[in-house]
Design a protein with these regions (language model features):
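Extracellular loop-to-transmembrane helix junctions
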Residues: 1-19, 72-102, 111, 354, ...
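Selective recognition of specific alpha-helical transmembrane segments in multi-pass small-molecule
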Residues: 7-19, 130, 134-138, 173-176, ...
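Membrane-interface "cap" regions at the ends of multi-pass membrane proteins
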Residues: 10-66
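Helix-loop-helix module between adjacent transmembrane segments
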Residues: 10-11, 90-106, 110-178, 253-257, ...
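Hydrophobic, membrane-embedded alpha-helices of multi-pass small-molecule transporters
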Residues: 47-64, 206-212, 225-299, 359-368
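Loop-to-transmembrane helix boundary motifs in multi-pass membrane proteins
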Residues: 123-127, 131, 162-167, 284-293, ...
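Hydrophobic alpha-helical segments and their helix-loop junctions in multi-pass secondary transporters
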Residues: 138-142, 146-156, 160-165, 177, ...
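Extracellular/periplasmic helix-exit of transmembrane alpha-helices
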Residues: 207-223, 284-343, 413-417
């Protein structure tokens, strides 16, 4: 628990110190923002700063800092280090700079920014890549809440139908994607964001009250086995199949750095009245998400390694797991991330906890899904030059967009392992998007004659992570660790040589 407290303090100091430095490097001023100069009453409009923060937090969070942190904790306390350093020096900086760069470019979406600084060909690649990722977000985040809702209502044949809830969620997606941002998103999302923050705060208080003995960074960096039979845990087998490098950095994305955020920040960049609010909104929302990830990583360690699962489930359920273990499921297989959320919230927080778990497991992914599709609509509209003031022109894009998303969802449901495959590719695509964004920000800082190492180092690191995952993953090239690591080093050298060559060429032209 001492490591947990130190990590919390580190994130707060990161916001106060490094966040201030990042804002100083960018240099926000009092120039008119797109919310004022391009106001259209649909996507460009001024919203209160507190509301923008809450919407931004909910948009970028979803279930990422919860599910990802729970699974990331299976690697041990080393997950704390990735959340701290990833969030402060990569994720929060990535979100702030991409959001502010969007403001400086009239509220432009990510592909437009990439095209401006990395070239037209890269822009076209990013357009396809971004829209595919956003459609995958929509498909993935409609499937899991539909399963949860059908399970809750399973006593009724109609209300307990998974297909019924998929249709309901998709209808909501269509409405939220088409309507002006202040009609649903501006009114409802702050409430959901408050619920997630309240849940995280209540769990943090519960951790301080219980003060469980957990592995510390300085004594058990990867080994978390304290009170359980190692065979029961299943973490050793998990780590063997998914090596810590690069899989930890893919598993914990939203709590450290996530390329998806760069598609969401422009949504709020179009609603900010003053550039100087960028630090608390963009950098602050990501630090807040990092704190949520820390809390859930600690809850996961308590649940699996301290024996917390025995305290949270009934004696009958505990005996049932023990009886089935021989040839059956390990702890991490029997209690997956959504199950841990439900059990811990209900056990620690009572009836209110069950409601909060429902909001976290259902509302959060749905709200990420609809803003993802809204971003896709705006990215496509920006690319083809179709204004979005009229409902008819919004439908021109939304109809084919939703048709393709439904196609991905149908494939996911028909394939026995479809969800897991989509999720893995979503995780890789998500982090690959951050690579494009970080290189874009690096070029921008070079052109502005500002310190570019702050984006160059994360860009190189995430380039290595994404290339290694592509080389080593069983669902991709599956080359084996030695070949994958060798290949990633070669890619790192190529990326660095490319940048240095471009940098020297650019300097000569100045």
């Amino acid at each position: 628990m001492v490591s947990f407290v130190i990590s919390l303090v580190a994130l707060v100091l990161g916001y106060l110190l490094y966040g201030k430095f990042v804002a100083h490097v960018f240099g926000p001023d009092d120039r008119p923002t797109p919310a004022v100069t391009k106001a259209d009453g649909v996507d460009f409009m001024v919203l209160p700063s507190w509301k923008i923060f809450m919407i931004q937090f909910l948009n970028i969070a979803g279930t990422g800092p919860i599910f990802g942190a729970i699974m990331g904790a299976w690697y041990g306390p080393v997950a704390y280090l990735w959340i701290i350093f990833g969030c402060i020096f990569a994720g929060a900086m990535h979100d702030y700079m991409s959001g502010m760069l969007s403001i400086r470019n009239g509220g432009a979406g990510l592909p437009e920014l990439v095209g401006k600084y990395l070239g037209g060909r890269t822009k076209k690649v990013m357009l396809v890549f971004s829209v595919l990722l956003l459609m995958m977000v929509g498909a993935v985040f409609v499937y899991s809440p539909a399963i949860i809702m059908s399970g809750i209502c399973n006593t009724d044949a109609f209300w307990g139908s998974q297909m019924f809830w998929i249709v309901v969620i998709f209808v909501y997606y269509v409405i939220a994607t088409l309507l002006p941002i202040d009609k649903i998103i501006g009114k409802v999302y702050p409430l959901f964001a408050f619920s997630l923050l309240f849940m995280a705060g209540a769990l943090m208080i519960g951790l301080f009250v219980k003060w469980p003995t957990l592995p510390e960074l300085w004594s058990n960096l990867q080994s978390c086995n304290l009170n359980e039979n190692p065979a029961w845990l299943g973490t050793e087998s998990f780590v063997q199949k998914s090596p810590i490098f690069p899989c930890l950095f893919i598993t914990i994305a939203c709590g450290a750095i996530s390329g998806f955020h760069a598609t969401q920040s422009p949504l709020m960049a179009r609603c900010m009245k003053n550039e100087k609010m960028g630090r608390p909104i963009f950098y602050g929302a990501m630090i807040t998400e990092g704190i949520v990830a820390l809390i859930w990583a600690t809850v996961s360690m308590y649940f699996f390694y301290y024996g917390g699962w025995r305290e949270c489930v009934s004696p009958e359920a505990a005996q049932q797991f023990i009886a089935q273990f021989d040839g059956g499921k390990s702890l991490i297989q029997n209690f997956d991330a959504p199950t841990v959320v439900k059990i811990v919230c209900s056990s620690w927080l009572g009836g209110a906890g069950g409601i909060l778990a429902l909001l976290g497991g259902v509302a959060a992914p749905i709200t990420s899904g609809d803003t993802a599709l809204r971003s896709a609509r705006l990215i496509i509209a920006e690319f083809i030059g179709l204004e979005q003031r009229s409902m008819r022109k919004r439908l021109y894009i939304c109809v084919p967009l939703f048709a393709l998303t439904v196609g991905i969802l149908v494939w996911q449901m028909e394939n026995p392992d479809g969800f897991n495959i989509i999720w893995q590719y979503f995780g890789w695509a998500n982090q690959t998007l951050s690579v494009f964004t970080l290189w874009t920000l690096t070029v921008y800082l070079v052109q502005q004659k500002k310190p570019f190492v702050m984006t160059l180092v994360p860009a190189l690191f995430m380039t290595v992570i994404c290339s290694t995952f592509l080389l080593i993953s069983p669902t991709a090239l599956a080359l084996g660790e030695s070949l994958a690591y060798t290949g990633s080093v070669i890619i790192l050298v190529i990326a660095l040589v490319w940048f240095l060559g471009w940098y020297r060429s650019y300097q000569k032209k100045q």
